[in-house]
């Protein structure tokens, strides 16, 4: 008798451990890269800060499943998610290449916009693409109560009975395919 399958037991845990190992490996590579000490320190601090931001964003994303979420809430969360990853990558290159503080600030804004674009695109694909196109069941985020930007906007735009129905279905555990489809049409 198996209480759980191998993937369920080791899949997510292994992924988290592998990510932690890769993160520490990246810090090791940077620390031994041979760049000037000041640049290495700046990049290490950047990695630490953006790693913290990504984890904060994931925590916020989970909490949003259980709370009403505003556009401001989403912006805070999204500014720390993919935007942090793009910022870390772009800033690392800029710092090591000797970019000025002004250039780094401009690149940070670019990274934030790229990150927002990535998150919005990923959420739209996750909601509307077929399983064949996306590799996951369509509407999976809706099914678990996530609140991507387009759902937050929909909640702000709907009124009366439609708002109540929409919100009720979003809060429902395991909505049916028909209910998910109804949410998609709003």
Regions found by a protein language model. Name each.
Residues 158, 164-186:
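Mobile late-domain/C-terminal helix-loop "cap" segments
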Residues 1-163:
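Mg2+-dependent prenyl diphosphate-binding active-site environment of isoprenoid biosynthetic enzymes
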């Amino acid at each position: 008798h198996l209480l759980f399958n191998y993937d369920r037991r080791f899949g997510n845990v292994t992924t988290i451990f592998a990510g932690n190992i890769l993160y520490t490996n990246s810090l090791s590579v940077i620390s031994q890269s041979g760049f000037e000490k000041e640049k290495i320190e700046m990049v290490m601090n950047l990695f630490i800060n953006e790693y913290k931001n990504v984890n904060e964003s994931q925590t916020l994303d989970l909490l949003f499943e259980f709370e009403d979420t505003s556009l401001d809430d989403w912006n805070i969360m999204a500014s720390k998610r993919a935007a942090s990853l793009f910022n870390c990558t772009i800033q690392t290159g800029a710092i090591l290449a000797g970019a000025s503080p002004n250039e780094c600030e401009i690149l940070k804004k670019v990274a934030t916009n790229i990150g927002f674009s990535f998150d919005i695109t990923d959420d739209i694909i996750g909601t509307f693409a077929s399983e064949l196109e996306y590799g996951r069941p369509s509407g999976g985020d809706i099914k678990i109560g996530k609140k991507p930007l387009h759902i937050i906007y929909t909640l702000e735009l709907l009124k009366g009975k439609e708002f109540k129905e929409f919100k009720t279905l979003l809060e429902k555990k395991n909505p049916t395919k028909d209910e998910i489809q109804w949410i998609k049409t709003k």
